[in-house]
Amino acid sequence: MSVVFKDPNAYKGRVYCFHNEPVQRDVMGYKVAGVSKGDVIPQGTPLVANDNDTNGQKTAKIAKYAKVKAKTSTTVFELENIGFLAVGDKIFKSGATDPTLSTISKIEGNVITLSEANSQLAAGDIVVEGKTVETAGGEGAPSGDTPVTVVVPKDIPNRIVARTETMTTLNQTISATHQAIAIKNVLDYPEEWLNAETFPGSVLLKGCPLILFINQ
């Protein structure tokens, strides 16, 4: 089934996600995996891009996240927009100290049901697709080399979709940017994707430091 966004060019019904329009676009576009004919990919969608894959092509996939609109129970949540999240995806609360990774077992419209309870999530929170990794003696690990399992984002985006695109063919390419000024409080990206230490009051995209986020 195609993914259709209402008012795809604007976020929150009134604001564009870039400080200057039109935003600078990369030369040529990216073939995006995991999308279908008829899907609408909004401006501001985060991408994990590869400028030269094993076939010598420019390819990308969508980094998944969403904002919680309402909480029905510890397993049922309404999102502001389901975006490209799918059944089977694992998500966690952005910014949580010890995040719980939960699997999406059901989707109805913008309402998701989790296969296990997640008491950390509430209205206004950002959820991001995640995975577990083992660390030893590094960040998140106790002293010594005892392995610990931590939850981290599945993807760190390095491009942002430059303009809204509707997929008319499966081989269609998507315009993206690696150099832009984006509006942080419009896109609501997870903090795990951002570097907040470079400029006071603004941040950079971890995967691409030429994309600057400002509050407006």
Locations of the language-model features?
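Surface-exposed, low-hydrophobicity beta-strand/loop segments enriched in small/polar/acidic residues
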Residues: 1-216
